[in-house]
Amino acid sequence: MNAYKKQKIGIFGLGKTGISVYEELKNKYDLIVYDDLEANRDIFKELFGNNLITVLSDSRWQDLDKIVLSPGVPLTHEVVRIAHHFNIPIISDIDLFFEKSKNLKFIAITGTNGKSTTTALISHILNSNGLDYPVAGNIGVPALQAKASNEGYVLELSSFQLDLVKSFTVKVAVLLNITPDHLDRYQDMNDYIAAKAKIFDRMDKDSYAVINIDNDYCRKIFVLLQKDQSIKLIPFSVTKILKNGISIVDDKIHDNDLTYKLPLNKNLQGLHNCENIAASYAVAKIIGLESKKILESISSFQSLHHRMQYIGSINNISFYNDSKATNAISALQSIKALDNIYWLAGGIPKEGGIEGIKPYFNKIKKAYFYGQAKAMFANTAKNIIDFVICDNLEYAFNIAYKDAVSDTTEVKNILLAPSCSSYDQFKNFEERGELFIKLSKRHWQ
């Protein structure tokens, strides 16, 4: 951290990331801080006092050596304009983290969907085989608050974080997929793709790029990277067997010329999780693990909360919590993985609603729509599937459970895959998912 000695640094954004930056830099540098959200400023005041909170109109923001920007702050924000006008470098918490951990190995994962599961799965595989690779980043653990390691880290990086990173070099960079998302932040789809591709800007001759070539956008990036002879490329696919790369087809993992049976794990169902497994397997092989050890670790993985999380079964009914599925593309992955689904969906709808799920409505036994999206979703589903319009998630769950119990089908699944953000009725997707877990567990406790 000597590079920041006696410097004047501004911290903009006081959520989890901003707080972690402050705790890293406090008492070492001349700091000022701010956040547009009064709630975040109030939390900061309670923790650290009011002395450092400085509005943007204060001239001290124009006389800084650096500004550490939280990833949620749009690059069109006034603080960014000030930084550019006064030639103040903007950095991120990832830059600070890398500076103090630069001798370690970094595995970075990005993609529109599946980042958190893949990050956790890679960490699980490595750690269960005697290595020490904690998770950090967008997975919910700010990098600067990550568990100490002498070996390396598995970092989940969003496009927002990749926009900010300046000095970070990775051992392995993973690109899982790219689908339309965050288009309120980016000018267009090309701008969003370029943000994701930045994960490959920070590689050296010893680095590996692991890329899903089933995805059209990712495949184009793969083709471009083939022109750079210094980067080692590992493609993966779940639709075809690759001669050189990792494939999962027909419940088998194909590792170049070798073939292994895919381990059964209820927490990793569906084609989307095959992508996550393929990427994780590739990374573990790069780090040096044997295939047998990797497969054993995959079979013992416990899924992250709220991400196609298997809760349990009773009366031939299985309960799955995919509260993190905040758009139709994410929800579709869970729906593809199951049959005879009693589907709970609703909240604040995203553009396009559930139109993208219509080709798979045959997997849904009955739907239960709630929240702001209920009328919109009902309009999409009418004359195609049975549905009930509900006031809230708890009411939807109770009706769904009653219907599932009366169904004589051998296997039934109650799935929370909202396809919406949660803010109309919940603080966040975690709170929504916890309610579903609580309601599910009532029936076998």
UniProtKB/Swiss-Prot annotation:
The keyword ATP-binding applies. One of its GO terms (cellular component) is cytoplasm. The keyword Nucleotide-binding applies. It catalyses: UDP-N-acetyl-alpha-D-muramoyl-L-alanine + D-glutamate + ATP = UDP-N-acetyl-alpha-D-muramoyl-L-alanyl-D-glutamate + ADP + phosphate + H(+). Its main location: cytoplasm. One of its GO terms (biological process) is cell wall organization. ATP binds at residues 111-117. Its EC number is 6.3.2.9. GO terms for molecular function: ATP binding; tetrahydrofolylpolyglutamate synthase activity; UDP-N-acetylmuramoylalanine-D-glutamate ligase activity. It holds the Pfam family MurD-like_N. Keywords: ATP-binding, Cell cycle, Cell division, Cell shape, Cell wall biogenesis/degradation, Cytoplasm, Ligase, Nucleotide-binding, Peptidoglycan synthesis. Pathway: Cell wall biogenesis; peptidoglycan biosynthesis. It is an enzyme of class 6 (ligase). Signal peptide: none annotated. Cell wall formation. Catalyzes the addition of glutamate to the nucleotide precursor UDP-N-acetylmuramoyl-L-alanine (UMA). This is UDP-N-acetylmuramoylalanine--D-glutamate ligase. It comes from Rickettsia prowazekii (strain Madrid E). The gene is murD.
